[in-house]
């Protein structure tokens, strides 16, 4: 077979899996199989590979057309072939651990934080709180935190859904608003005459 008469094999590769999670590169999917020579009705041996196996597709509309190339073993008889295979790109999970330090009633409230975070660093985070046990959940405004009475509370954190990540609800943590100790000034130089009661003494 002369170079100008080389045959173009047809077909598509077999994928080791049809879906990946956002953050995974294309080369986490292995390509295998053979193409077919429709002229002679025989299978064509060769090697498949991704054009860019390090590429990390975004979720987009959920389907990504990934480009592959097939290099035939017999390059004198067959042409190199390229094509695309559709794969599903699924959203990835996010994670975070909420924490909140306790404080004393009457002092400035602590600020909740989210640590050990994975996912989209730009995803919106919403904090909320409730009295431990039976309180209704309410939004915690970091810029204008509520004035809470002494007691035990739960802090919640919610990471918002993004184009490539699912939202995440962090496990709540508990924090304590401690009772305050009243301040006072001990009176001095008090005097009383014999026969007076304490009620008669001016403070």
How should these model regions be labeled?
Residues 1-203:
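Solvent-exposed beta-strand/loop surfaces, strongest in extracytoplasmic domains of secreted
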